[in-house]
Amino acid sequence: MGTKNHEAGCEHPDFEEKTASFEAVHQRILLDAKTTDGANQVRLDCPQMIKKVRTYVRSLLNGTSPMDEIMELSYIHKNGFQKIVLGRKSGFAMRLHRYLPGEGDQNVHDHRWSRLDSLVLEGSLPTNYLAYSKPNNCDAEKWERHEYCKAGDDYVVKHQGETYLAPDVCVHHSTGELYSMDAKRLHRILPATEPVATLVVTHPVPAERVWCNLYQKRIIEELEPVHEVRLTHQQMMASLKHLERLLTQQIERCATMATSKGVWA
């Protein structure tokens, strides 16, 4: 999927954003995405964006911005990572994902939203990308395809028959890397040997995209009950403090890179 970089606002890495609301972050997201259909990459690696996010996180930590909605929307995902929703507006959402060592996705899947942009803030995220294949290809494997559909406040799973997938590429997305994928990109996060944290923006879900695809080796007869474990206030504060440190480190990386470019210019 092609990406387009937007340099506006990235020229002044020393600029410190003073506005502490998620609205300031949201406006920066819209500036990069251009349109609400998620046509362009959100430059999460841009110093101005990172500083807006850090200012907002600091306001959450010092109590000047409310955390009620964040606490309500965030939980520990069954695949072994903390999913912290920092804010949502006009179809866009910004999240912090913290992966525990040794935990990974239980299935191959795609997404409902039109696009995902992700900046690795800590560790290296091993990701296995797959593609549809013909049964007679030597590296093809048979998988059971399911549609995972949202129905009101609940989800239902429908078996759609077998299909064949083959490995496309296995990538370790490293610290400081910004990567993107569209709704149809099949992937699976593999277990990491170290803690991993990513800052993620999901783009609006198309009106007709009420499902995503899940692929497993067995047929899922019915969804197992999912008990979403909510973060305690103490866990949330610890993760936000950790995020603030990671954002500061990312700003320092940007400054180092800018200095290096200046030296070699």
Q: For each of these PLM feature ranges, what is it?
A:
Residues R95-D110, Y129, S133, A183:
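Conserved short histidine dyad/triad with adjacent acidic residue
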Residues A131-K184:
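Short acidic-glycine-tyrosine-enriched beta hairpin
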Residues T127-N128, M181, L186-A192:
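Short beta-strand His + acidic residue motifs that chelate non-heme Fe in jelly-roll/DSBH
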Residues D117, E194-V210:
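A short hydrophobic beta-strand segment most commonly corresponding to one strand
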Residues M71-L73, G104-D110, R188:
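Catalytic micro-motifs at enzyme active sites that drive phosphoryl/nucleotidyl and oxygen chemistry
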Residues G2-A93:
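A short, N-terminal "cap"/entry segment at the start of jelly-roll beta-barrel domains
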Residues E208-W264:
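Long, compositionally biased interface segments
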Residues R112-T127, A131, V201:
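Short, conserved beta-strand element in jelly-roll/cupin
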